[in-house]
């Protein structure tokens, strides 16, 4: 069962990176137990696979027709957030951001800080800085392809 566990988690890593960002947290938690998974971890991984099976037809639709875009924010916009000391093992904070283009997510990130922040404000500042760096990248991208979208 350990070999099955490892190969299944490895396969899910591919899905997370390319098609299923909604599995990122679950897969990252399972990666922590790759060397010695217990029955609890195997049962949990089977629940993830059932979730994957039941949500196989769920996806993102990128439709830029005028009829659908009337009810959707246009251009590039993003959000960020941080959770101060939310990891009970390390007391590290989680930072996250997501950027949308024409209503569809095009870039996202969620990760534990590499260091311990001293306050909620510090955690939020770090998340804002990370999101601003990503917004700058998108600005350069749109400038390079000859169009201009403002990040909101």
Regions found by a protein language model. Name each.
Residues 1-152:
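Divalent metal-binding acidic/histidine catalytic loops
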């Amino acid at each position: 069962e350990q070999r099955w566990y490892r190969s299944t988690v490895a396969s899910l890593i591919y899905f997370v990176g390319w098609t299923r960002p909604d599995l990122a947290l679950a897969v990252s938690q399972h990666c922590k137990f790759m060397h010695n998974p217990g029955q609890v971890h195997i049962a949990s991984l089977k629940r993830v696979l059932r979730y994957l099976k039941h949500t196989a037809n769920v996806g993102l639709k990128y439709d830029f027709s005028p009829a659908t875009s009337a009810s959707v924010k246009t251009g590039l916009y993003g959000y960020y957030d941080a959770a101060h000391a939310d990891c009970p093992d390390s007391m590290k904070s989680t930072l996250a951001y997501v950027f949308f283009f024409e209503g569809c997510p095009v870039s996202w990130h969620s990760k534990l800080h590499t260091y311990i922040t001293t306050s909620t404000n510090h955690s939020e500042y770090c998340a804002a800085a990370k999101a601003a760096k990503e917004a700058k990248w998108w600005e350069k991208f749109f400038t390079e392809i000859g169009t201009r979208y403002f990040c909101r």
